[in-house]
Amino acid sequence: MSRVDFDQYAGHYEAIIAAQTNFFDGDSSYFARYKIELAHQLVGPVESVLDFGCGIGRSMPHLREIFPKADIVGCDPSADSLAIAREQNPTCRFVSMEELGADSRFDLVIASCVFHHIPPQDRQMAIRYCYSRLKECGHFIIFEHNPVNPVTRHLVKNCPFDADAVLLSMSETIERMRDAHLKIDKSSYCLFFPQQLAALRPFENYLRWLPMGGQYFVCASSRKRDAVRAA
């Protein structure tokens, strides 16, 4: 399977995302904001954040709003995506993985729907890389598509830049993070209710055990920390 070249999609990535997610919420930024708000619930305020696989920087406005004092850095292999991200988010820094200094460490590393693009044989190396970027007591949160959800599978199958996607289950993600010596703090399913059922969204916390959310998250830390908050 050939790898997707995200430089080819950078200029119209936003339009593709909007078309793909319109059925769930007319505001295509809903997903990005949802995840950053959830990250804040999980770990509280932080001084530094790395968005691993940041793409065109769709999470950056929400990271800047919710973590206003943090040093926020995005990294991505797509140079064209980084160029767009820099233009649209002047208060954040954007670098390639090669440009990220060897000593750079962060309180929080987020990877949002990144790992299904990474070949399975390379995933452990990518998780270890993210682990190596954590400060002591830092947190690493992976958000991923839920392969158990049939709607999610349909969307991935029909998304042009998911042509190389190999979905990974929550159990695989947890196992890989544990193998990298991360402590699992919390794992749950999320994104259950579309905009038409927005009145039910406050009840998602009671359904996080149910493997029918559109996505899931796993929050882990670089060592035991009792201060992780329930979300």
Provide a role label for each language-model segment.
Residues M1-V43:
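Conserved class I S-adenosyl-L-methionine
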Residues R58-E99:
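Class I SAM-dependent methyltransferase SAM/SAH-binding core
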Residues I110:
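A conserved beta-strand element that flanks and buttresses the S-adenosyl-L-methionine
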Residues Q124-E136:
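A short glycine-rich, Lys/Arg-flanked "PGG" loop and its adjoining helix->strand segment in the class I
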Residues C137-E144:
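Conserved beta-strand signature within the Rossmann-like core of class I S-adenosyl-L-methionine
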Residues N146-A163:
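Short, glycine-/aromatic-enriched active-site segment of Class I SAM-dependent methyltransferases
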Residues V166-H181, S187:
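Short alpha-helix
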Residues D185-A231:
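A C-terminal cap/extension of S-adenosyl-L-methionine-dependent methyltransferases
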